[in-house]
């Protein structure tokens, strides 16, 4: 099943303790030559079914940092979470700055996260969020939508961008920008998003940034990410360094903007 093994065992209704479920997972894994998590237990009409799912090969570690252009209210919003099979990271940038931008950015990010958790694809989630922003008020509303979904069994990563700034992938220690220019959601009847599929491995990073971080272009970001990857920096530190450096550069140019970085690193899952 998409690179992962599943097993089901049905028996007369039985109660199991947590240690017993862990032991059953270990024995089932030995028989199937796979590593399983403790099973989900379903009981109905005198029968009990144990559902075993293979442990993922990877785990995701998240980090985020940000700063507002003025005051403490930022139009950027981040959501980072793991479903049973995938790591999800979302960055939305509300149009403009201040509280109106914060409302749009937060609405887009939170609604996208809920839809992904419910099983919607990125493309369909973007269409629904587009409608929500368009109906929110009579005033023009809009936000960028930037998300990456990483299969924790295979390392396959699906990237979707609508109006978002280029992101970055660090694979094998080399950083490269990802993404082209497209329109935000909420300002047109349709969604002009772009999607692509890449493959990541343990030790790789995925980075989403708002356009305020790229005031001086993407070159310095790629170099910094390669330095951080070589040092094995945790995602929280990577995000903080990017935001602090971008803020210093923005102050020199006199073009302040909301600045946000969201970072995901893949690590081997301990079995």
Q: What role is predicted for each listed range?
A:
Residues 77, 82-84, 88, 96-99, ...:
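Cytosolic nucleotide-utilizing catalytic cores of signal-transduction proteins
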Residues 1-85, 135, 139, 227-233, ...:
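Terminal helices and disordered tails flanking the catalytic cores of nucleotide-processing hydrolases
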Residues 9, 88-92, 206-208, 262-264:
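Short, well-ordered beta-strand elements
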Residues 1-3, 23-46, 102-172, 247-257, ...:
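Catalytic core of PPM/PP2C metal-dependent serine/threonine phosphatase domains
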Residues 8, 157-161, 176-179:
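Amphipathic coiled-coil signal-relay and dimerization helices
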Residues 94-118, 176, 181-182, 187-189, ...:
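Active-site-proximal, acidic helix/loop segment immediately C-terminal to a metal-coordinating Asp/Glu
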Residues 14, 69, 85, 96, ...:
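Short, glycine-/Ser/Thr-/acidic-enriched flexible segments
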Residues 54-76, 126, 130-136, 165-197, ...:
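PP2C/PPM family metal-dependent serine/threonine protein phosphatase catalytic domain
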């Amino acid at each position: 099943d998409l690179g992962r093994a599943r097993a089901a065992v049905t028996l007369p209704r039985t109660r199991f303790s947590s240690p017993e479920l862990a032991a059953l997972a270990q024995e089932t894994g030995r028989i199937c030559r796979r590593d399983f998590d403790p099973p989900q237990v379903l009981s109905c009409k005198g029968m009990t079914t144990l559902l075993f799912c293979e442990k993922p090969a990877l785990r995701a570690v998240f980090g985020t940092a940000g700063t507002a252009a003025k005051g403490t209210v930022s139009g950027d919003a981040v959501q980072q979470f793991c479903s049973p099979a995938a790591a999800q990271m979302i960055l939305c940038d509300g149009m403009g700055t201040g509280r109106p931008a914060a409302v749009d950015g937060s609405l887009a990010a939170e609604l996208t996260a809920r839809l992904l958790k419910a099983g919607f694809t990125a493309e369909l989630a973007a269409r629904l969020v587009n409608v929500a922003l368009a109906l929110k008020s009579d005033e023009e509303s809009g936000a960028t939508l930037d998300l990456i979904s990483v299969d924790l069994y295979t390392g396959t990563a699906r990237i979707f961008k609508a109006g978002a700034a280029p992101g970055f992938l660090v694979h094998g220690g080399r950083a490269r920008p990802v993404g082209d220019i497209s329109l935000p959601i909420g300002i047109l009847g349709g969604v002009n998003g772009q999607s692509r599929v890449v493959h990541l491995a343990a030790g790789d990073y995925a980075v989403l940034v708002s356009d305020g971080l790229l005031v001086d272009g993407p070159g310095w970001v790629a170099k910094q990410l390669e330095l951080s990857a070589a040092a094995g920096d945790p995602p929280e530190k990577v995000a903080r360094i990017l935001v602090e450096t971008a803020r210093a550069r923005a102050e020199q140019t006199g073009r302040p903007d909301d600045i946000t970085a969201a970072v995901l690193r893949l690590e081997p899952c301990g079995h």
